[in-house]
Amino acid sequence: MSGELVVGLLDSGVEAALATHLKASRAFVDQGAPHSLGHGSAIVRIMLHHAPRTPLLHAQVFGERQRTTPELVAAGLDWLRDEGARIVNMSFGLRHDRAVLRQAIAAAHGAGMILVASAPARGAMVYPGGYAGVIRVSGDARCGPDEISALGGAPADYGACPRDADGRLGGASFAATHVAGLLARHLRETDCEPRALLDRLARFHGRERRLA
């Protein structure tokens, strides 16, 4: 893909004060408080920390509750593809592999989109992180906001700071966004293959060792 580097976000709603940073936004959920979860707003803040000049597309696939469906995610991803997103951040994981989501991921990957998703540090595989071509990211307490670790695929491909931009919230979902943000920052200046770029940027290699 060529042209302007645009980042797509699949998440919950975004508060009005941050909506001005969005190139376009579309809701794929029914009525409800558009940003009551706060998660989508936290994701936007992380992206602005890493790549403040990068255009952002926002597909709201979560409503008032922390729930979505493979059909909603697939519809949002298809829209982001049609709107020209090059990098897509998916800071969530669904328990089950579903054909509709698998096919949407395959179409996006085939179109040259860079797909980043969160993955748990322990436990069963989740989706879309479990699909081929998706960069899987888990939280790594060793990493600051601008640092990543190369984990070699188990439990994830990369680790990153598990905190939001304010340091108040934590989880693998924010780690994925830090990686997507670093990709957006650096791919504005280079045509390097995404995984090769992340390997080069990695400060740590191998899994985080936690003492009992």
Give the residues covered by each predicted segment:
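Active-site core segment of subtilase-fold serine proteases
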Residues: 1-50, 54, 138, 209
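Subtilisin-like peptidase catalytic core
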Residues: 31-94, 203-209
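Short glycine-rich anion-binding loops that position phosphate/pyrophosphate groups of nucleotides
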Residues: 14-15, 92-95, 121
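Extracellular S/T/G-rich loop segment that most often corresponds to the catalytic His/Ser-adjacent loop
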Residues: 5-13, 124-188
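Structural detector of well-ordered beta-strand residues that form the stable sheet scaffold
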Residues: 57, 114-116
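Mature extracellular/periplasmic domains of secretome proteins
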Residues: 1-2, 48, 68-89, 98-113, ...
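C-terminal subdomain of the subtilisin-like protease fold in secreted/lumenal serine endopeptidases
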Residues: 86-87, 188-212
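Conserved protein kinase catalytic core
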Residues: 17, 66, 97
